[in-house]
């Protein structure tokens, strides 16, 4: 039997699954997994179930003439405060083209990164669908934007935190490759209902923000509770 194209790909995944299960059965509950034995999709699924919880960057960019693109990314973190940088890892479309978020950021140099509340989980998920370039997720999600004071792009209404950013750098990484987007924060919007003052510092109430967090598969998480531990002096 000869396999071609997608058949070879599926067969390779099947063999990889058998190897993974064999390792699991051999070691029982004490898993020590050699990633070189896994298929790329298995590595992805394992990473997204173990690097948890992950914050979600809900990114708005301009496709041109106020036609806004919106997409969520959970390979996302803060990397520096001087300069104030955020990093988002963006993959490719199924056909191998760069995603609109990357394309728009490169062309306009601007993006707005939102922290989505848990009650917008359905909208976040819906905005992850692949659309044709120029189609807007704002239409499919029926979300509204409002003016982002002091920044060129608008922000999403209903998101308690928004970062107005300029593009700092894009680095291509890996075999796919992924686009690592480094965005420098120029303006921050915080809903006044989630902030208070502690001396000369602003304090953001994390439970009031109620940020949506990403787990593996289709699963999300919420904070539910916070606690403090004093740092050593």
Question: Can you name each region flagged by the protein language model?
Answer:
Residues 8-10, 19, 202, 220:
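Polar low-complexity intrinsically disordered regions enriched in Ser/Thr and small residues
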Residues 4, 9, 13, 25-27:
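Low-complexity, intrinsically disordered or signal/transmembrane-proximal segments
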Residues 28-233:
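Basic, polyanion-binding surface patches
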């Amino acid at each position: 039997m000869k396999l071609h194209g997608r058949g070879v790909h599926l067969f390779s995944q099947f063999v990889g699954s058998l190897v993974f299960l064999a390792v699991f059965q051999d070691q029982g509950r004490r898993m020590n997994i050699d990633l070189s034995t896994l298929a790329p999709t298995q590595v992805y699924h394992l990473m997204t179930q173990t690097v948890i919880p992950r914050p979600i960057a809900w990114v708005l960019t301009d496709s041109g003439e106020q036609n806004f693109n919106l997409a969520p990314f959970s390979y996302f973190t803060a990397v520096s405060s001087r300069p104030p940088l955020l990093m988002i890892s963006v993959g490719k479309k199924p056909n191998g083209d760069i995603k609109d978020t990357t394309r728009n950021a490169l062309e306009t140099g601007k993006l707005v990164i939102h922290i989505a509340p848990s009650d917008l989980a359905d909208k976040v998920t819906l905005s992850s669908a692949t659309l044709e370039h120029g189609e807007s997720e704002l239409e499919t999600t029926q979300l509204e934007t409002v003016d982002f004071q002091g920044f060129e792009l608008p922000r999403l209404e209903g998101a308690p935190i928004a970062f107005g950013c300029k593009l700092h750098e894009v680095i291509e990484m890996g075999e796919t490759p992924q686009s690592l987007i480094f965005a420098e924060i120029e303006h921050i919007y915080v809903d006044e209902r989630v902030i208070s003052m502690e001396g000369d510092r602003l304090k953001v109430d994390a439970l009031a923000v109620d940020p949506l967090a990403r787990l593996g598969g289709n699963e999300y998480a919420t904070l539910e509770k916070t606690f403090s531990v004093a740092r050593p002096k």
